[in-house]
Design a protein with these regions (language model features):
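A short acidic, amphipathic alpha-helical/loop segment
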Residues: 72, 96-100
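Hydrophobic alpha-helical segments within soluble ligand-binding/sensing domains
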Residues: 69, 128-151
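Anion (oxyanion) recognition and catalysis
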Residues: 52, 102-103
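Bacterial N-terminal signal peptides that target proteins for export
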Residues: 1-9
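Short beta-strand elements of ligand-binding domains
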Residues: 85-88, 104-120
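Extracytoplasmic "Venus flytrap"
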Residues: 27-54, 58-71, 75, 79-81, ...
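Cleavable N-terminal signal peptides
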Residues: 10-11, 21
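Sec/Tat signal peptide C-region and signal peptidase I cleavage site
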Residues: 16-23
Length: 152
């Protein structure tokens, strides 16, 4: 399910680009905070597949901290990327990420971690793709409770 969600994020980013921007050489970034983790390796794998299927190049960059995140956006812009998907190392970087992206006229989709503004409030205007982990946990708890009650 989560692999599918990540592929949808990449597809969504491609879809929000203008038709004239969608070309054989279109580039989109995929920035992740922990590239050594199998979870993110899988995300990159499916982003590459979406890129191959839809005709865009995925530029994968590790962004373990704020400085590397902002530098990565500069690098993406220099390479001609039209936008990026990001799992930020720190949600409080949201305003800086968005300011830098706007400066380059790049589209952004946040993944997993919702950006927060200076007051710590969610930045609801930034597209977000994530799992409903809380709801999944609640459902698991309910099912475990039922199993436990059945054995009492």
């Amino acid at each position: 399910m989560h692999k599918f969600t990540k592929a949808l994020a990449a597809i969504g980013l491609a879809a929000i680009m203008s038709q004239s921007a969608i070309a054989e050489s279109m580039k989109l970034g995929f920035l992740v905070k922990q590239p050594e983790e199998p979870w993110f390796q899988t995300e990159w794998k499916f982003a590459d597949k979406a890129g191959k299927d839809l005709g865009f190049e995925v530029i994968k960059i590790a962004v373990p901290d704020g400085e590397k995140t902002l530098n990565a956006i500069d690098s993406l812009a220099a390479s001609g990327a039209k936008g990026f998907v990001i799992c930020t190392p720190d949600p409080k970087l949201g305003p800086a990420i968005m300011a830098k992206a706007r400066g380059y006229d790049m589209k952004v989709i946040a993944v997993d971690d919702q950006f927060a503004n200076a007051k710590g409030k969610p930045m609801d205007t930034v597209p977000l793709v994530m799992m409903a982990a809380t709801k999944i946990g609640e459902r698991q708890g309910q099912e475990l409770y039922k199993i436990g009650r059945a054995h009492v």
